[in-house]
């Protein structure tokens, strides 16, 4: 039998294997209609409004910083009127989804791992089995669905706040009228960009929820191990967010199809 330190390693292969299997079980239970809707509404508040302030603050600041850097370069090229469009492309396609999902992973993913991990080490999960209650239906599926529903909304709100931050900086420091900024945004952004943004939000939400729950369910030991699981869940969720973002970019991005002449 493997030592406990190996079995409960924060980044052990056993945890990754369990989480991949858990994702399959989540799909199966979802297709069978097995979930606790009351629990979903409860977790919608925990993952949505509870995460809104840090998400909006991070996106506003990121929007202001990105606009400063972009406008500085475009002004030297005489293309300051295009700052809104360049900002919108980068922020909508990459920055808003990644920043928002990272904040949610830090706040919600760690909470899921800690909550379920604490239940695991205190044998509350075993008690659910005794009561013939499936933890996937009662604990995991509601959390994952709540993340899938709220992360896209938070990303859209973050995008709006980022644009507002960009408008403020462009107007205050570069004398670019807000209408010119917004017209540039409208000219560069396409409807497919918003669709991809929502698609990324669902993927990121599913990853955050599944990893947080998976790391919680594979926690053994005591309070120290619960903390380690929560920390590891945030790290793994962050990596998963970037991997999924790369996959979506490769699948749906406008990649060159041939070599230049």
Can you annotate each of these PLM segments?
Residues 48, 52, 56, 95, ...:
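Selective transmembrane-helix segments that form parts of the transport pathway or gating/packing helices
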Residues 43-99, 103:
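Active-site cofactor/substrate anionic-group-binding motifs, chiefly glycine-
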Residues 102-120:
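A hydrophobic alpha-helix feature that marks transmembrane segments and, especially
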Residues 116-141, 223-226:
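Short cytoplasmic-facing helical segments at TM-TM junctions of multi-pass membrane proteins
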Residues 69-92, 160-202, 210-232, 251-261:
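Membrane-interfacial helix-loop-helix connectors in multipass membrane proteins
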Residues 58-61, 101, 141-170, 211, ...:
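Hydrophobic alpha-helical transmembrane segments that constitute the membrane-spanning cores
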Residues 2-38, 215-220:
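Short, membrane-interfacial amphipathic segments enriched in basic
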Residues 226, 234-249:
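Final/C-terminal transmembrane alpha-helix of multipass membrane proteins
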